[in-house]
Amino acid sequence: MVMDKVPMPSRAKAKAQRKKLHINHSFSLNNLFSDPFALSSISITLLSWCIAIAGCIATASDTDNFPRFTWWGIAYQFLILFMVIIFYCYDMVDYYKNFIAGATAVSFVYNTNSATILVYGDGSRKAAASAGVILLSIVNLIWIFYYGSDNASPTSRWIDSFSLRGIRPSATQDASMRARRRNRNNLRSQRFTGDNFYPEHQPQNYMSSMALTGFENPDPAYYTGPNVPLDRNGSVAYSDNNMPGAFTQDMNANNQNNLNPNNFNQNNSNQNTFNQNTFMTETSNGNTDTTMGGTLELYSDAGEESFPYTAQTLYRYQADEDDAYEISFEQGEILKVSDIEGRWWKAKRSTGETGIIPSNYVKLIEDNIAM
């Protein structure tokens, strides 16, 4: 079997791909100091590590039967502590939560193994070393529980609620909501071509009541010809019996008859019969013959919208290409919001672009910034 060779991307193309949809993270200690959980747990870990390393050095200088593998456990714990600090300072914890949880689990095994050897030793030096590794084991267990959980979990949301940066967004929750919304859009875009459903090119039975004052036709215009199959483009295979001209003549005849007051009662008596042939289009709500334009008011761009709230974006967000309702925004951007109910809010950018945004990516601020 001959495999087609895929050309390697050039340096410029690879660099462009790395920068695409990427957030630029800069080093800042404020990212660490603004999170009470990270600051407290890292401080306890650093203090416990100092106690453990001091006790191990003192114990190793006193006796020759000190467990050598404990040195690797202490060094490995310091490496994990250093990496966690770097992740917080660059605000990249959400990208490496799985790695932190797995690496901390390995460190938990190392520390508990060292604790079982040192805790039964005699002397204050071994007691200090055992106390240090026990404290490290406790912190490691807490880290496994926190970093191994999703940001949308109740415990993570409770812990992150005390942070100055607020609750962190959940990638898993956003992906599931995107999938559910995409499925709804696919169902809404389906076209039925059976006996009771017609494509979107079919004329709609709706006209403004203001335009028909005095000339109302209580019966909707419907097609009286035979039900013929549709081709892939949704066009009807016309014949001598179902030409569009006959359909137009029937409509004009109905309008002329409606001008005669004597035919008003007759039209009302035939209304139920005509309603049986009424078809349902894409804009029908399935229960009545009225349009459902108001149902999609959240996604409509027509008309003057009111955006009484002001929000500032906490992170950069790239809209899903498969969802036409989402909009992208940059970190620190000011948006106008019209509705703050639910997980997805309707917002307006300074450029005039309107769409929906995830609520956990923004925070409400005082309305003192002009768009």
Curated annotation (Swiss-Prot):
It is found in: Cell membrane. It holds the Pfam family SH3_1. Its main location: membrane. It is a multi-pass membrane protein. SUPFAM superfamilies: SH3-domain. Residues 306-367 form the SH3 domain. It comes from the Eukaryota. Residues 1-36, 90-98, 148-371 are cytoplasmic. Disulfide bonds: none annotated. InterPro entries: SH3-like_dom_sf (IPR036028), SH3_domain (IPR001452), Sho1_SH3 (IPR035522). Residues 173-200 are annotated as: Disordered. Coiled coil: none annotated. Belongs to the SHO1 family. Plasma membrane osmosensor that activates the high osmolarity glycerol (HOG) MAPK signaling pathway in response to high osmolarity. This is High osmolarity signaling protein SHO1. It comes from Zygosaccharomyces rouxii (strain ATCC 2623 / CBS 732 / NBRC 1130 / NCYC 568 / NRRL Y-229). The lineage of its organism: Eukaryota, Fungi, Dikarya, Ascomycota, Saccharomycotina.
